[in-house]
């Protein structure tokens, strides 16, 4: 008898082991993950030579020593609806990770149930349809009551849930990096609009100076015409000039209004609480880039960090999809009381205990698991390719913005020389007027070329400031990848 029981136990063990080993669906096709760009590929072309400088610092705008700009950016970062939306995406990603993690933990629930039923005289429980109190049967109506604790645990031996949780945590880390990218975009957007407005204020001042010079010329020519000393052609020429300047003044004032309204929307100001922006001089800008990019660029660009985490999350999703091919094990248990008579429910004899280990073997699924794995792998490879292109685009941004800024610096040096040359001519005209060699009109009009060249210099300075902010943004704006969020 004992030998027979041992034989049966051995047979069951052999069959169970064989089923465990072979009891999984066949992975028909799974391509390898695409390669990510290597750090040595993250560099500028050899023929691009730019000035060397350090990486931008956090809160880079404070180095510009402009209280107005600082207040605008602080207000934007504290009240932006776009940033609030990004932070809500963080919370959503965190809740999704918590939800998946909770599903892999021990689940315990209290259970209470009443079941009023009529037992069929022709069913499996037909004997209980009789009314025989002596036998403990008072059918056909019964009220079954059940109370107790129900527990379940998925053992997750192959990491289906574990990989899914890791993917959700990766998505949460990506959301954190995306929030930093939104903050960077908002700060740089405010700074660019702010300095565009400052440049417009300075342009308006130069145009008004030009208007005053030409207005003097108009009055001088008008006086000469009135005294018969000059034909009307110079007068009408000066009138055309002043009208052209007036047109430019109107355009610049309109541009100031447009920029202010764009800034109002970006900082989240209402119709009556937009802070007054006073004119200030444009700042000196940093024109260099770090000596090397490589890993540093990946760690300092929040958008690249977000993409990297999405890639990692996609690889974890592939691991989860592969684990679905293997057997899954779970354990369910119940401990409580069950009785078909309410008055006996809480008696010792009503105790019930169930222990239910379970095994699920994916043998034939019509290709569902393979289709899921193939789609998940394709999505992961797409994310890797998108990441690779994003890295190349980031290097391109640094190269293009750095080159543009260096070109603007060279142009500014030449334009500064032109301004100085016209100023020399103006000073010569004023000296000639002081010696009585030329008229006051000629000395005054000598100011016009200087103003024109100063406008050109202002436009270059404005573009340099905007371009330097764009370069700073392409270098990450002081962002550094911090500690990652891990499973609690």
Swiss-Prot record:
GO terms for cellular component: cell outer membrane; membrane; transporter complex. A lipid is attached at residue 24 (N-palmitoyl cysteine). Gene3D superfamilies: Outer membrane efflux proteins (OEP) (2.20.200.10). NCBIfam families: outer_NodT (TIGR01845), PRK09915.1 (NF007390). Could be involved in resistance to puromycin, acriflavine and tetraphenylarsonium chloride. GO terms for biological process: response to antibiotic; transmembrane transport. One of its GO terms (molecular function) is efflux transmembrane transporter activity. Belongs to the outer membrane factor (OMF) (TC 1.B.17) family. This is Multidrug resistance outer membrane protein MdtP.
